[in-house]
C-alpha cells in the first residue's frame, strides 16, 4: 500500500477528527526553545511562512479534484483539512509573536510578495505540484528528526504541542502531493507544460 492509502485507512480507523485548540497566552519569552534564542527565532520564522504556504498547497492541489477518483477526493479533503488547520494554528501563534513585540509584518509581506505575488502566477501547475511535493518531503524529513529526537523537550509546552502536532500530520500526509505528482509518470518537460495557464 502507498502512504496515501495508509492515511485513508488510518483516518477510517480513528473515526472523525476534531481540530486541536491552542492557547499561547502563557508564552511570555521570545527564547521559548529552552533559552536558545537562535533556534526559537528560526522556528518563529518558519511559523510566519506557514499560513500562506499551506494556502498555496491547497490552491495547487485543488486543480486535481475534478480528475480525482472518489478515494483520491477523500484523500484531498483530508489533506486540505489538515493544511488549513496548520495555517490557522500558526497564524494564532504569529499573533502572539506580535503581542510580544516582534515586528513580523515586513518579513511576511516580503516573502509572500515574492513567492505568491510574483512567482506563483507565472509558474505552470506542473512546476507548482513539484514544488509542493518537494516541500512536503522536506517538512516530513524535518518532522522525523524533531519527533524522533524529542528536540522540543525543553521548549515551552504550548509551542512544543503546536509543532509536534503539526509535524506528526506532516509525516502522515507526506506522500499525498508526491503520489498525485507521479500518477502520470511525468518528465521534466511535463513540469513546464502540464495544465499550463
PLM regions and their residue ranges:
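Non-heme di-metal
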Residues: 4-197
